[in-house]
Amino acid sequence: MYYTDKLESLKDIFGTEKVQILPNKLVVDTDTYPIIDDVIILMVPSQYPKSISEKLKLSPEKEKPYISGFAEEIQFTFGDEWQTFPDILPEHYQEFLLYFDLVNLNELKNKRVCDLGCGIGRWSYYLKDKCRELVLLDFSEAIFVARRNLKDCNNSIFFMGDIRRLPFKSNFADFLFCIGVLHHLPTNALNEVRNLKKFSKKLLIYLYYSLDNRPFLFKLLLPFATIVRKVVSKVRNSTFRSLFTLFGALFIYIPFIGLGNAFELFGLSKHVPLHEAYSGKSLHRIRQDVFDRFFTGIEQRVSRKKILGLKDTFDEIIIGETL
């Protein structure tokens, strides 16, 4: 069994000696968590995607009551997204460097690092040789893609669970990061950042920003993009989603990239939306971001001022300037 040599780590993560690893299940105190394909399922049955319920042969009458704040559409969308775009691409490495520019990676060597909302594990993939242990958690079936992408990484523990209901002990992680996740939750994103403090003393969080430092055209286009997102995010048809991501990439993103390339001659490319973020990216990578951008029903944006308001909880706040 994959977790046989990880018993001590699991005891430390859950903060109890009462941990047993049994065939296809993990027992912690009085709680039992199924294990499917090396992924420990922390959620209650009412939060299970259909495929998980079927694998566990659960009947509807045995499922627990609906959980308040549970966003099934977000679970569906991100599970669908990462199964549609499961690959870790070469350009992800450059993105990794941008997201982690505030982190001294050398300091992670003997640390336990937690990736909350890990998706396909694309950031953990570049950390697997830089830390002692990785803990990956996602709310969707993308966690199984992450397991496959890190199949040769024996220092990793995989959980499927709800970020807001973690059964882990306080300060279980030396470093915790959550990239592009909390702004999609149905609860206040900044409050969720505050709630994560108990799990690690050092956090790296990426949230959508309210375009404080962007030119006027960015702010002008955002309301139109939001209207489109609210409409198309309700459509779950896979053919529609595939065609929409292709259309969006070819007829919205790439034209803006081309316009930005032309404006580079005059030093004005920074004023063109999408150019800086997507210039040089592959069509596949752009389509994945179109999916991410337009098929999520919930999108929160925060200002620099509101981020600095987190000083009511944290001793130090550092805001990155690269993204």
Label the predicted regions.
Residues V145, N188-V193, Y208:
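Catalytic cores of eukaryotic secretory-pathway lumenal/extracellular enzymes that build
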Residues I307-D312:
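Amphipathic alpha-helical segments
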Residues K202-K234, F240-L243:
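Conserved class I S-adenosyl-L-methionine
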Residues V232-R304:
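Substrate-binding/catalytic lobe of Class I Rossmann-like enzymes that use SAM or dcSAM, i.e.
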Residues F175-T187:
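A short SAM/SAH-binding and catalytic strip from SAM-dependent methyltransferases
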Residues L190-K202:
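A short glycine-rich, Lys/Arg-flanked "PGG" loop and its adjoining helix->strand segment in the class I
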Residues K50, R122-S124, L185, L211-F216:
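Short catalytic/ligand-binding loop motif for oxyanion handling, primarily in non-cytosolic enzymes
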